[in-house]
Amino acid sequence: LVTYLQEVRKHQGFMVPGPAQAAAVAALSDQTHVDIQRDRYRRRLESLVEVMAAVGVDVPMPGGGFYLWAPAPGGDAWGFARRLADEVGMVASPGEFFGEAGSDHVRLAAVAGDERIELLRDRVGI
């Protein structure tokens, strides 16, 4: 049985090839890309917080991730999402998409490129 399993293992690709292992070591040993991406998302989130302040909504910076949860004025997340789309050109998801607890919020993702976020800033006059 052991001989058979050794033969099966040899042909099943259970071993990661040496070049792939070396590439993984190189990719994981330098965290510069993590710092760059974290800073990029932080800047985008800060800009979105300012955009929301310009439309009269106070949104705290998140402790992690790249989403902002903005309270919907009057608790109307659908109406607020429409308002952001119509007045600012910003896409927001009504919080109820993500569970009942978010029903009076909208979720904003800081995934648009910097130039798109700058356009939002221009639209609200900041």
Predicted features along the sequence, with ranges:
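A general structural signal for well-ordered alpha-helical segments in protein cores
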Residues: 2, 20-21, 77, 81, ...
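Accessory recognition modules or surfaces
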Residues: 12-15, 24, 47-48, 68-85
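A short linear hydrophobic-aromatic micro-motif
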Residues: 55-59, 91-96
